[in-house]
Amino acid sequence: MYKRQVYVWLDALTNYITGIGYDAEGNSSEQYKKLWPADLHLIGKDIIRFHTIYWPIFLMALNEPLPKQVFGHPWLLQGDGKMSKSKGNVLYADDLVDFFGVDAVRYFVLHEMPFENDGVISWELMVERLNSDLANTLGNLVNRTISMSNKYFGGVVADKGAAEAVDEDLKAVVTGTYDKVAAKMEGWRVADAITDIFTLFKRCNKYIDETEPWVLAKDPAKADRLATCLLYTSDAA
């Protein structure tokens, strides 16, 4: 029988500061002084109580500053419920990364985890989302923009013509998207910000369809207009 026992959450929570060099005698490391307090403490919603009640109590007892913000993120569910080994429905991150790549997995998780509610993940949903967003919407936009810029101007596009109404409309959408995304990121609404970004990408693809650079390229007299359209597309993308 042990004579001394330590509450598991006391031991676990203090690792946030001891791991970066906190010293109770006042000799904390430069890394601790640089990194603490945390600007954002990102945790799972199931352990909010420990991070917003117990952890602040521990820190105040030590006269150490509290994290500036705490965000309890939602869960990713498999189908209609939690993943469980007993149910055999667990998705392992390593398997997803090996198949899709780490950036694609990161994108899906950020997109499918709403601010207020739990998200859903499955192999089928990942394939559908990545094909729809990264391949069709973003991939198509990047491919069209680069291909036409290389084909018609050797990859170097200069502003040679005056902007028309359709150009100014795209510019306004870009500016408005920046403001909306910045505000949502400040509020940790990452999924909502991603939705706004991809709405812009869809607008850019529509702009290409509206201006028809491939038609303009057939008329040498419209070379300046062609350059302007591709410049706006490049800047927006």
Segments (PLM) and residue ranges:
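Conserved small/polar residues in nucleotide/adenosyl-binding loops
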Residues: 1-5, 232-237
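Structured secondary-structure scaffolds
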Residues: 3-151, 193-197
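Helix-rich, typically C-terminal accessory recognition domains appended to large enzymatic cores
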Residues: 112, 125-163, 170-234
